[in-house]
Amino acid sequence: MNPTTKRAIKEIVVYALAFGCSWYAAHKLLSTLDPYRQKRQDTVSKSRKRLDEWAGEQVKELETLELNEYEQIVASQLVLPSEIDVSFDDIGGMDEHVNQLLQDVLFPLKYPEVFDTHGGLLSCPKGLLLYGPPGCGKTMLAKALAKQSQATFINVSVGLLTDKWFGESNKLVDALFTLARKLEPTIIFIDEIDTFLRQRQRTDHEAMAQIKAEFMSMWDGLLSGQSRVLVLGATNRPADIDEAIRRRMPKVFSIPLPNAEQRRKILELYLKKVPLEANFDWNGVVNATAGLSGSYIKEVCRSALSVPRRELFDKHGNDLEAIKYDIQSGGLRSLKTEDFYHYESLQNVSGIDVE
C-alpha cells in the first residue's frame, strides 16, 4: 500500500471519528437541554409497566405488540379492569340505562361475531355520548361499562394530546387510535368532552383546529372498518360539542337528576350496610332530597352518619381508644330519620332550607 493511500485512509478514519464524536456530543447536549426528556422517559417507563399488567389481565402476548414512541406515551393512560372499583350493581336508580348499555353497546362490543350481521346494523356503535347535570353518574356508567366488558380503557385528557412542538399533537392523536385498534376491544373515554371537542370557531388556535381535524379523521377510519373501538364522551354541556363530533356519536344517553323512585334506590344502595332505626322514614328522606344528584345524595348520607359519630366524640371527649372500643362493641347508634334533617346533613350540602 503506497503512502498516499495510507494517508487517505487515515484521514477518512479521523474524519469519521470526529463526525461520530461530534454527533454524539450534540445528541447528549440536546438531550440534556430538553426540559421534557425526563418526563418522556418516565412516561415510557410507566407505559411499559401498564402494558405488562394489561397483557397479564387480557392473557395476550405482549411480544407481538409493536408500539412506537407515541403509542407508548398514550399507553401510560391505560386503566385496567381490575383497577376499576365500580360495577353496574353499584349504580342505583339507572336500571333502564344499564339495560340499554348492555344491549346496544356491551354485548356487541364483547361478542362481535354474534352482532356483526344484517349489514353491521347491530354492531357496536363507534361513538357514545352521556350527558346530564354534574354528579348524576355519567363517569360511573363509563367505568362500569369498561369493567363489565373487560375492554381496554384509555382515559384521555386534553393534556395528553397537546404538545408544544408543531406536529407532535397530531402524532399523539394518531397513536391514540392506532393503539386502541391494537388493544381492542377498547373504550376511549373523554370526560368533559365539550372542553376538548367544542364548537369550532374562527378564533380557534391553528394547532387546536388541526388536533380536532386529525381526531375526526382517525375516528372516520373506525367508522369505515370493523374495529371494536368505542369513543365514549361525557358532558353536562352537550350544546357546546362540535356538530361534526355529535354526528359521530349516534348513541346518546341523557342522565337527568334522579326521580323519587331512583333516589330511593340510591339511598338504599348507600345505606345497605348502615343500621337504621325501626321506623326509619324512607319516603320523608326521599322527598327531602328532591332535586339532588346521586353524588349529593351520597354526601347527605355521609353527613347524616356523622351525627351519631359526633355524639360519640362528645361522649368520650376525643378519646380515640374509647371511641374505637365503643364503635367495635356496637356503641354507634342506629341512624335516625331526623339525622338527615340536620343542618349540616342537608342544608349545607344542597342549599335547601329545611327549617
Curated annotation (Swiss-Prot):
ATP binds at residues 132-139. It comes from the Eukaryota. The keyword Mitochondrion applies. This is Uncharacterized AAA domain-containing protein C24B10.10c. GO terms for molecular function: ATP binding; ATP hydrolysis activity; GTPase inhibitor activity; membrane protein dislocase activity. InterPro entries: AAA+_ATPase, ATPase_AAA_core, ATPase_AAA_CS, Mito_OM_Translocase_MSP1, P-loop_NTPase. It is found in: Mitochondrion. One of its GO terms (biological process) is negative regulation of mitochondrial fission. GO terms for cellular component: mitochondrial outer membrane; mitochondrion. Its main location: mitochondrion. Belongs to the AAA ATPase family. The keyword Mitochondrion applies. Keywords: ATP-binding, Mitochondrion, Nucleotide-binding.
